[in-house]
Amino acid sequence: MHELYLWPFQDAVHAGVGSVMCSYNRINGTYGCENSKAMNGLLKGELNFQGFVVSDWVAQHSGLASADAGLDMAMPDSRYWGDDRLANAVDKGFNRTRLEDMAVRSIATWYQFGQDEDDFPELGVGMPADITLPHEYVDAKDPAARPNLLQQAVEGHVLVKNIRNALPLRAPKSLSIFGYDATSAWAANPAEEGNVAGAPDFWTQSWQGVNLTDEQAHQVGSNAPVVDPPGTYHGVLLVGGGSGSNVPAYISTPYDAISQRAYEDGTEIWSDFASHSPSVVASSDACLVFINAFSTEIFDRPGLTDDASDELVNSVASKCNNTIAIVHNVGVRLVDAFADNENVTAIIFAHLPGQDAGRAVARILYGDVSPSGRLPYTIAKESSDYGNLLGPCQAGKGRSPQCDFTEGVNIDYRHFLARDITPRYEFGFGLTYSSFEYSTLQVDINATANDGEPIGGAPVYTNGTTQNTENDSVIVGGLASLFESVGTVTATIANTGSVTAAEVAQLYLLIPDENVTASNSSIVNTRALRGFQKIELAPGDSRQVTFGLRRKDVSRWDTVKQAWVIPSGAFEVFVGKSVLDTPLQSTFTL
């Protein structure tokens, strides 16, 4: 719990986050929004969170029990707290101090973020009082944000394969563009309820996802209807789905942006967005294939691949020896079906770039900027490499499935390290159009950082109402000592290539674990990410990067002492380009 799941929440609370949402699922048999251990014990207790806890939509399952457990606000409404129920509960003995605490936490957050100030942006009204009514249209555009939005879109692209100098493109004479992801969706109209009448669903869960009554496009020269592959989105995938999604003010599609470049360069553009096995113009200097992988609320992808999209890439590659695959994806998407195809010369994970999808990918493809994204997850060679991660709840299906999390801290790259599984593309991996050299690793550690004593115990939280302040070392985020510096790790990075590019230096630590012994081989200790920095360097330039280490970064949670402890022994340091490419290594002892 502490070393993995609570870890990012602790940093978020320490940074001043105002609200935390409790989940739908149960934790050890108790709903998240009435789980006192999670909300009172961990969040408001150990982390000293001063903001409010809000339920996910309709995730409240009780009245006084959820209030006592730490829930401060129920959304979108509450049949348990509505009308005079809470007031009546106080009259019957419910803790009035807790009720006031719920209100204070919500109002204090309002002031924390300056929402009472005159210069605070006017809030749009998106949700009516009657939640069954359509939401009002909210114009959330900010012209000042446009450059930042484009920059984020560009930096979200991860180049994982680039052979035979396929990229960047250099004023090609002829380009062919394929794939259902290269153009706009059939409709983007917030005035319509759900999907536009007569058009197929935007996402397709199976080959049967298009109804016979839907309007259908047809393959060129064929009566066969166009049906998107399973787990995909019809049109360029811009954003995730669900209640947090939006309709962009405009859409720059890959086809539009590349067509503009073609106009400037005098390039011929050929395209086929419908056929699953398209013909290819022989004169094509390069063939771009755009596919995607989509999921949203209440809809999980059937798997981490889809055969139809893979077949499309391989079909084009069988006719074009310079095929470039671009995947707009919501998360892990396996590509082993075509990754080793020698005619697939480049692969880009474009993720969710938003309204500037086309402009962003064009800047990458044409070398206006070197790609600088890195994988925030591991791409396996096959689905089974992830173990039971893809289906941990097979036992006890139904309304109350039981999911036992037995993997400890070894998820994603730590799972692959622990089981010595070679991935297709490792965590932190990503190519650029340049090359970088790492040198001069220096580790400076405070030798007195480890005094052999636990770093405090779990702070006490009483009655779900107020923080025990007897221990003045407790700050927002938890024990103050956890955020104290214990040292630094520095390294020098040089751009040894011919173009300006950004490198993402990454620091990993292997913390000693006394539970790992020759007689207990079931526990495998693995390195963990402890920092990363992105720096842009011109050709020939070099720069030093420095990673700070906190007590938290070199500690383990002792389940017996119920406290953070800095273990004694040798700590291994790894600095490099990814979790598996760490040319600089060292050790220090505490």
Residue map of PLM features:
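Short, flexible segments with low predicted structural confidence
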Residues: 15, 24, 71, 128, ...
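Short, functional N-terminal and low-complexity linear motifs
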Residues: 5-11, 50-54, 69-74, 108, ...
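C-terminal non-catalytic regions of proteins with extracellular/luminal or membrane-system context
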Residues: 6-7, 29-34, 57-60, 86-90, ...
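Conserved, charged catalytic cores of large soluble enzymes
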Residues: 14, 100, 104, 108-136
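Second-shell residues forming the walls of enzyme active-site clefts
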Residues: 1-98, 105, 424, 475, ...
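Short acidic (Asp/Glu) and glycine-rich catalytic loops that position anionic groups and cofactors
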Residues: 17-22, 65-67, 79-88, 129-134, ...
